[in-house]
Regions:
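Generic structural detector for well-ordered beta-strands
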Residues: 5-11, 56, 69, 96-98, ...
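Beta-strand/loop substructures that line and gate deep hydrophobic ligand-binding cavities in soluble
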Residues: 80-134
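Hydrophobic ligand-binding cavity/cleft-lining segments
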Residues: 1-43, 48
Length: 152
């Protein structure tokens, strides 16, 4: 199963970064390139342990839906969402927030299993792993910019 790890250093407290990362409206704002929007479950505000959200987005020209649930939660330090329905055979996204002085190291670890057997494995190697890394990295940069520059 492919895994990507993206680390983003943010000059803001971990609690602020943690809450921004859980904000459903902000998630949609920071993924606007894929026309992402929350269509079911928690569709606004901060998602909590046990809650789920369904996002609809356009990836590779195809409109898709992905539902994930928060399965682990440690306030200001970590939350984990797992796909419960969507295009992947499985997907898990671990969001970690490590305080460093007065700043935060935000670490996103995403692991997935693509569908379609060998074809999914080939897609992972040819383009999907790179696409996922870019998608998560760009969202991290957007969260960093908001955390460091906007009052929310």
């Amino acid at each position: 199963m492919p895994t990507i790890i993206i680390e983003t250093f943010i000059n803001a407290p971990a609690e602020r970064c943690f809450d921004l990362a859980r904000d459903i409206g902000l998630h949609c704002q920071t993924t606007s390139k894929t026309k992402e929007r929350a269509v079911a479950g928690v569709t606004s505000g901060l998602i909590e342990l046990g809650q789920s959200v369904t996002f609809e987005a356009v990836h590779f020209g195809v409109r898709q839906r992905l539902t994930s649930q928060i399965v682990e939660y440690d306030r200001s330090k970590l939350f984990v969402d797992e796909m419960t329905k969507g295009i992947f055979a499985s997907m898990c996204h671990v969001h970690e927030f490590e305080t460093q002085d007065k700043s935060t190291l935000m670490r996103d670890t995403v692991t997935w299993k693509s569908p379609l057997g060998i074809w999914g494995i080939i897609a992972d190697a040819l383009f999907l792993k790179r696409y996922m890394a870019k998608f998560i990295s760009e969202r991290g940069v957007s969260l960093k910019d908001i955390a460091e520059n906007e009052k929310q």
